[in-house]
C-alpha cells in the first residue's frame, strides 16, 4: 500500500492558502468587476475613445489573471482529490504519481499568485519611470550611474518589459550625470517601487592612477505613470518651459534642432526633460506626462513620512537613505533593509535583481 499522508497534507495546505488569498485579493469583487469591464468592452461606442478602451483592456488583463488563476486552483484541487480517490480504489501507484505531479504544479501556481498579491497598491500594475542621478564624486559617481542604468535595462529586458530612454545627461569625462527611462509592462511599478533610494558603490576606481578604493553614490527614484483621468491640477502659469539642443544618445536628428524640452514646475521645484522625440511637441507631451506622474507621487509621499523625507533629501546623495551596498572588491552586494546578499556581483550588475526585489516586497517595504 502506498503512502497517502504527504499528498493529503499538501492538498490541505493548498486549500487553506487558496481560500486565504481568495479573501485577500477580494475574489468575488474582482469577478463582478470583470463582468462589468467585459460588458463595457463589448459596446461598439467604446472604440470611439481608444485611450479608454486601452485602459479597460489593461484592467481586464489584470482581473483575468487573478480570477482565472484562483478558479484554476479551486478546480485543480478538486481534480487532484478525485485522482487520489481513483488511485486508492484501483490501488494504482501511477495514478497517485500523476496526482502528485498535478499537486506540485498547483503549488507553483499558488506561490506565484501569493507573490503577485504584494502588488496591491493602486498603481502597482502600471508602467513607471525610473530617474537615476549621480551623487557627488565626479567621474566615479557618474560612471556608477551609467552602470546602474545598464543594470536596470538588463533587468527590465529579462522581465520582458519594454524600455524607453526619455532623457540622458552625459558625464564630464565618462558615465552619466542623470538619466530617465520609461518602463512598460505588467506590474512594472509594483516590481520597481522598492528600488527608490541611494545605491552605494565601493571599488578600486579605474579613473584613479593609484588604483585606490573609492566610494560613490547614485540615487534611484521610481514613480508610476498616472492616467489622464487622475485629477492633477497644473497651472500653466506655474511652468517654465525651455527648449534646447539634445546631447548624448538619441540619433542624429535630435542634435540638429532645438527639439529637447525641459519643464520646471516652479511651486514644487520639479524639473522634467525629454529629448528622445522627433519634435518639440512630442517631447513636451512626454514632459507633461512625467510632471503629472511626479506631482501625483509627491502627493502620495505626503501620506508617508519616511518616503517624503527621502524625496526631500534626494539632492543630498550620500550616506543617508541607502538601500543597497555594492562592494566589488569583496564580491559582496547587500541590501541594507532586508539583509539579503549576493556574492555574484557581475550577475547583479547584469540585471539579476529579483532576489533583492522579492525580499523587499515580501518585507512590505
Curated annotation (Swiss-Prot):
This is Peptide chain release factor 2. Peptide chain release factor 2 directs the termination of translation in response to the peptide chain termination codons UGA and UAA. Its main location: cytoplasm. It comes from Haemophilus ducreyi (strain 35000HP / ATCC 700724). Belongs to the prokaryotic/mitochondrial release factor family. One of its GO terms (cellular component) is cytoplasm. It holds the Pfam family RF-1. It comes from the Bacteria. Keywords: Cytoplasm, Methylation, Protein biosynthesis. Methylated by PrmC. Methylation increases the termination efficiency of RF2. InterPro entries: PCRF, Pep_chain_release_fac_I, Pep_chain_release_fac_I_sf, PrfB. Gene3D superfamilies: 3.30.160.20, 3.30.70.1660, Release factor. The gene for this protein contains a UGA in-frame termination codon after Leu-25; a naturally occurring frameshift enables complete translation of RF-2. This provides a mechanism for the protein to regulate its own production. One of its GO terms (molecular function) is translation release factor activity, codon specific. The keyword Ubl conjugation does not apply. The keyword S-adenosyl-L-methionine does not apply. One of its GO terms (biological process) is viral translational frameshifting. The gene is prfB. The lineage of its organism: Bacteria, Pseudomonadati, Pseudomonadota, Gammaproteobacteria, Pasteurellales. It is found in: Cytoplasm. The modification N5-methylglutamine is found at residue 252.
Amino acid at each position: 500500500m502506498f503512502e497517502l499522508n504527504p499528498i493529503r497534507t499538501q492538498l490541505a495546505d493548498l486549500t487553506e492558502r487558496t481560500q486565504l488569498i481568495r479573501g485577500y485579493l477580494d475574489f468575488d469583487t474582482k469577478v463582478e468587476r470583470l463582468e462589468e469591464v467585459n460588458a463595457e468592452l463589448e459596446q461598439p461606442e467604446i472604440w470611439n475613445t481608444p485611450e479608454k478602451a486601452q485602459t479597460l483592456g489593461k484592467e481586464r488583463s489584470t482581473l483575468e489573471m487573478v480570477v482565472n488563476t484562483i478558479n484554476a486552483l479551486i478546480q485543480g484541487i478538486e481534480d487532484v482529490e478525485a485522482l487520489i480517490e481513483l488511485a486508492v480504489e484501483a490501488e494504482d501507484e501511477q495514478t497517485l504519481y500523476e496526482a502528485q505531479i498535478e499537486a506540485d504544479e498547483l503549488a507553483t501556481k499558488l506561490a506565484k499568485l501569493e507573490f503577485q498579491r504584494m502588488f496591491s497598491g493602486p498603481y502597482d500594475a502600471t508602467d513607471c519611470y525610473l530617474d537615476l542621478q549621480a551623487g557627488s564624486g565626479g567621474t566615479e559617481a557618474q560612471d556608477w550611474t551609467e552602470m546602474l542604468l545598464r543594470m536596470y535595462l538588463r533587468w527590465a529586458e529579462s522581465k520582458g518589459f519594454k524600455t524607453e530612454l526619455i532623457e540622458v545627461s552625459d558625464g564630464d569625462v565618462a558615465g552619466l550625470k542623470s538619466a530617465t527611462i520609461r518602463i512598460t509592462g505588467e506590474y512594472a511599478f509594483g516590481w520597481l517601487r522598492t528600488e527608490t533610494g541611494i545605491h552605494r558603490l565601493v571599488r578600486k576606481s579605474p579613473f584613479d592612477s593609484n588604483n585606490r578604493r573609492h566610494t560613490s553614490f547614485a540615487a534611484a527614484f521610481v514613480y508610476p505613470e498616472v492616467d489622464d483621468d487622475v485629477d492633477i491640477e497644473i497651472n500653466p502659469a506655474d511652468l517654465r518651459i525651455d527648449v534646447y539642443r539634445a546631447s548624448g544618445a538619441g540619433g542624429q536628428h535630435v542634435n540638429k534642432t532645438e527639439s529637447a524640452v525641459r519643464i520646471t514646475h516652479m511651486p514644487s521645484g520639479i524639473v522634467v526633460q525629454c529629448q528622445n522625440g522627433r519634435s518639440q511637441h512630442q517631447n513636451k507631451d512626454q514632459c507633461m506626462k512625467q510632471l503629472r506622474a511626479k506631482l501625483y507621487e509627491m502627493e502620495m509621499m505626503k501620506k508617508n513620512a519616511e518616503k517624503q523625507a527621502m524625496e526631500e533629501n534626494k539632492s543630498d546623495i550620500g550616506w543617508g537613505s541607502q538601500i543597497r551596498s555594492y562592494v566589488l572588491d569583496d564580491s559582496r552586494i547587500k541590501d541594507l533593509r532586508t539583509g539579503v546578499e549576493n556574492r555574484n556581483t557581475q550577475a547583479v550588475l547584469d540585471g539579476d535583481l529579483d532576489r533583492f526585489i522579492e525580499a523587499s516586497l515580501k518585507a512590505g517595504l
